[in-house]
């Protein structure tokens, strides 16, 4: 129950975050729907405050907007999975699910990036063939890393104009 309640809180944060960044979400209605969902899950129970947050701490570790979109795309998917297990005949749950599906569609590229990260973490480098492939790609990977850090440095160095 604690997990679900924290999830509901983070759902509120996600909806507000994307609402502020130009999405077509109706925050007033969503807040009412989230309040009804909190009542469904008895989110005012005292055990909600026990332990660590479910998602908030994870989002804090991602600082750049594009990075946050990757982690938020996964969190939105988790909310959709959670809502599928509830009574979808209730209008507030149906509305939240529709809005989350809209968000997920706008985040589809970010979700693919997340899947790439999962795929990389599951990659087994024990076979000789895959090790050969990895070694042959090493220089290209290092080049990409250098390009990334160089472009960041160029952006952070703003051109100074002469005030003559």
UniProtKB/Swiss-Prot annotation:
Keywords: Antiviral defense, Cytokine, Glycoprotein, Growth regulation, Secreted, Signal. This is Interferon gamma. It comes from Anas platyrhynchos. Its main location: secreted. It holds the Pfam family IFN-gamma. One of its GO terms (cellular component) is extracellular space. It is found in: Secreted. Residues 1-19 form the signal peptide. The keyword Signal applies. Belongs to the type II (or gamma) interferon family.
């Amino acid at each position: 129950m604690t997990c679900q309640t924290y999830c509901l809180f983070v759902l509120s944060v996600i909806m507000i975050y994307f609402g502020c960044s130009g999405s077509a979400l109706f925050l007033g209605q969503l807040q009412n729907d989230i309040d009804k969902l909190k009542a469904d899950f008895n989110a005012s129970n005292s055990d909600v405050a026990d332990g660590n947050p479910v998602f908030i701490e994870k989002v804090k570790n991602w600082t750049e907007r594009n990075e946050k979109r990757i982690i938020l795309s996964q969190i939105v998917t988790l909310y959709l999975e959670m809502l599928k297990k509830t009574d979808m005949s209730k209008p507030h749950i149906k509305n939240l699910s529709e809005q989350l599906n809209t968000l997920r569609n706008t985040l589809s590229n970010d979700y693919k990036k997340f899947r790439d990260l999962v795929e990389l973490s599951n990659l087994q480098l024990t076979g000789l063939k895959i090790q050969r492939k990895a070694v042959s790609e090493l220089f290209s990977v290092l080049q990409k890393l250098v390009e990334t850090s160089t472009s960041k440095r160029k952006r952070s160095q703003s051109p100074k104009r002469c005030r003559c």
